[in-house]
């Protein structure tokens, strides 16, 4: 099997991943997708199809939903607990392969989980030594893997293939060009973690093959090699692991494409029916006169000939308009609450509103749990690679998805109780923090410093 082979689960899901990516990119990507997203009507020429496609409106409910969900989770900064490795905190400001802070890395991971339902992250370090760093791999970059049951009876991955794109100097001497390589992570016969790159080479028949480089066995500072595990975490919306899980917004993306198709049909119908058609019966002389249309123009027609205007009358377009509205409401029901028409929500009771959002909140809680577990495992690996004890290392994401600041009256009662000594400093400041009475930039560590 060549290194370019795809896992069966990858092959089954890549069409869905492609659709979600294009939907999130917006109208341009959807239109460039052509008949993949908008079938060409029978008998329609290429020029007519291009006009048909351009008239369609793309209402990106999927991207709005995604941005809203990410914003709900990250309306408060993640809490990063390093325990005995607190001295490593400054290094978290530039801990990724592109020198981004850990909070930005965590946000990108959660965004990929919400959008694609799959993302991987690798802890790696320069071969000549240096600080370890995090590298993110999208769902499309995790091309193959092999799961086995280890001696402890647990299912683990003992081989993972990752597709990467390197920039190399152009043959012309100007700029750069992209080269696809494959990074293989695997466990050796001695159960130690190793990796190697597969670089492209041209074969005699002018096709591209791949040749492996030397095997590299990463070493942890003061602890030797990794044994029985790989410093790679694959995230999903329900749990971590190599199995492909369904994207949380797949249903919304599919409805988004269907809405685009209905919009194209509606605009197509409006284009041909909105403008009236003028008609006139020419005289019997055989000459065909030219008629100008305008407010200052009068047509003189000999009897018994006549003229008139043809205008569209019917319910067909109303059905298409109704279909578009129904799809928007369905997207709203699946989680795209930013798309929903809120004009009737003023009289809605809090119990009904809570019931409407309960399903979405439950999904967000599961996603936050999964992301937290994976980010915590990654951070522990990073701390170990830095030669420190990962005990008590933890990442905590926000679970307060709704803006619910403490009321002024409640704050007065809390402040009075604190002044009278009825509650201690820790309870006072932490309640202020959780009630959003402290600046949004504050973290749990800032609260501890106040105490």
Task: Describe each PLM feature range.
Residues 1-137, 141:
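Extended, helix-rich architectural segments
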Residues 28-41, 45, 50-53, 58-61, ...:
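Hydrophobic alpha-helical segments and helix-packing faces
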Residues 93-101, 108-112, 239-246, 250-253, ...:
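Generic amphipathic alpha-helical segments used as scaffolds and interaction surfaces in large
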Residues 114-237:
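Extended, regular secondary-structure scaffolds
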Residues 122, 161-163, 311, 396-398, ...:
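Residues in well-ordered beta-strands of folded domains
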Residues 211-351:
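Extended, charged amphipathic alpha-helical segments
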Residues 287, 295, 300, 319, ...:
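C-terminal helix-loop subdomains that flank or include functional centers
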């Amino acid at each position: 099997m060549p290194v370019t082979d795809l896992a069966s689960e990858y092959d089954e899901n890549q069409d869905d991943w492609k659709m979600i990516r294009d939907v999130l990119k917006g109208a341009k990507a959807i239109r460039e997708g052509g008949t993949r997203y908008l079938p060409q009507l029978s008998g329609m020429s290429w020029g007519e199809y291009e006009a048909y496609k351009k008239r369609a409106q793309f209402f990106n409910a999927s991207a709005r939903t995604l941005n809203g969900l990410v914003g709900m989770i990250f309306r408060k900064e993640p809490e990063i607990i390093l325990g005995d490795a607190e001295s490593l905190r400054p290094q978290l400001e530039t801990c990724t392969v592109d020198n981004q802070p850990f909070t930005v890395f965590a946000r990108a991971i959660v965004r990929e989980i919400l959008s694609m339902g799959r993302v991987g992250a690798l802890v790696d370090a320069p071969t000549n030594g240096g600080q370890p760093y995090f590298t993110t791999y999208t769902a499309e970059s995790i091309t193959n893997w092999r799961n086995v049951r280890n001696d402890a009876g647990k299912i683990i991955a003992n081989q993972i293939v990752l597709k990467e794109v390197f920039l190399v100097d152009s043959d012309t001497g100007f700029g750069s060009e992209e080269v696809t390589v494959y990074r293989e992570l695997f466990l050796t016969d001695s159960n130690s973690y190793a990796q190697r790159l597969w670089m492209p080479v041209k074969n005699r028949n002018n096709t591209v093959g791949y040749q492996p480089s030397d095997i590299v066995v990463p070493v942890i500072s003061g602890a030797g090699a990794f044994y029985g595990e790989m410093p790679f975490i694959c995230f999903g919306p329900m749990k971590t692991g190599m199995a492909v899980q369904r994207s949380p917004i797949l249903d919304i993306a599919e409805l988004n494409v269907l809405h685009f198709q209905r919009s194209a049909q509606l605009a197509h119908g409006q284009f041909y029916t909105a403008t009236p058609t003028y008609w006139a019966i020419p005289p019997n002389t055989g000459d065909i006169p030219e008629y100008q249309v305008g407010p200052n123009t009068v047509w003189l027609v000999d009897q018994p000939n006549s003229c008139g205007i043809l205008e569209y009358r019917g319910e067909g377009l109303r059905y298409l308009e109704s279909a578009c509205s129904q799809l928007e409401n369905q997207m709203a029901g699946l989680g795209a609450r930013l798309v929903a028409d809120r004009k009737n929500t003023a009289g809605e009771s809090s119990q009904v509103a809570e019931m409407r959002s309960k399903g979405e909140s439950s999904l967000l809680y599961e996603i936050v749990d999964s992301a937290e577990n994976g980010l915590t495992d990654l951070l522990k690996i990073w701390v170990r690679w830095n030669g420190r004890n990962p005990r008590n290392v933890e990442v905590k994401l926000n679970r307060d998805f709704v803006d619910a600041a403490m009321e002024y009256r409640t704050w007065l009662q809390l402040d009075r109780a604190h002044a009278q000594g009825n509650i201690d400093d820790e309870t006072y400041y932490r309640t202020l923090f959780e009630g959003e009475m402290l600046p949004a930039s504050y973290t749990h560590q800032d609260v501890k410093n106040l105490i």
